Regions:
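Short S/T/G/P-rich N-terminal loop/turn motif that feeds into the first structured element of a domain
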Residues: 21-82, 89-99, 113-155
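Hydrophobic alpha-helical segments, especially transmembrane helices
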Residues: 5-6, 98
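N-terminal secretory signal peptides that target proteins for export/translocation
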Residues: 1-3
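Amphipathic alpha-helical coiled-coil segments
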Residues: 105-110
Length: 155
């Protein structure tokens, strides 16, 4: 009986803070979030996709201060598969990215070389930013934030 009370006490101590934290979603819009764009090159087009992606990467770095991380990685199980991983400072940074002329030129050049291009958003992204990405015609899945935090890296 004492053992049962001990277990119940432990459960109460450890589940209450988790439940409280689980109710604290981040506000959509002003917080950092992740976008993953998955690309699959047509046979024989991977090198051209890499070259075009390298060129736009430099332009995004130079012109988008709200893009905190921008990496292009190869799928380890498929030499024609790639993924952009992007961390945005906030939803406004995504809106700037979507309106970047260099991004538009990249998408126009790379799209004919692909047989797949999808996007996934993870986090507290504003409804306007999600709608703007979907308006590009890119199949997009948004995984809305349920709980968590964004560390302040300014201090």
């Amino acid at each position: 009986m004492l053992w049962r009370k001990f277990i119940c006490t432990l459960l109460m101590l450890f589940t209450v803070p988790v439940a409280t934290h689980a109710q604290e979603a981040l506000p959509p819009g002003p917080t950092a979030f992740v976008l993953k764009a998955r690309l699959h090159a047509l046979p024989g087009q991977a090198d051209q996709v890499i070259a075009l992606s390298g060129a736009v990467d430099k332009k995004v770095e130079a012109g988008e201060p709200g893009m905190l991380l921008h990496t292009f990685d190869r799928d380890p199980g498929d030499s024609q598969g790639f993924i952009w991983t992007e961390v945005y400072e906030d939803s406004e940074a995504l809106m700037l990215h979507l309106n970047n002329v260099d991004l538009g030129a990249y998408l126009a050049a790379v799209s004919p070389l692909l047989d797949e291009f999808t996007a996934e958003l993870y986090g507290a992204v504003s409804g306007d930013a999600v709608a703007a990405l979907r308006a590009t015609g890119t199949p997009t899945t948004h995984y809305p934030n349920v709980l968590g935090y964004v560390r302040d890296l300014t201090s």
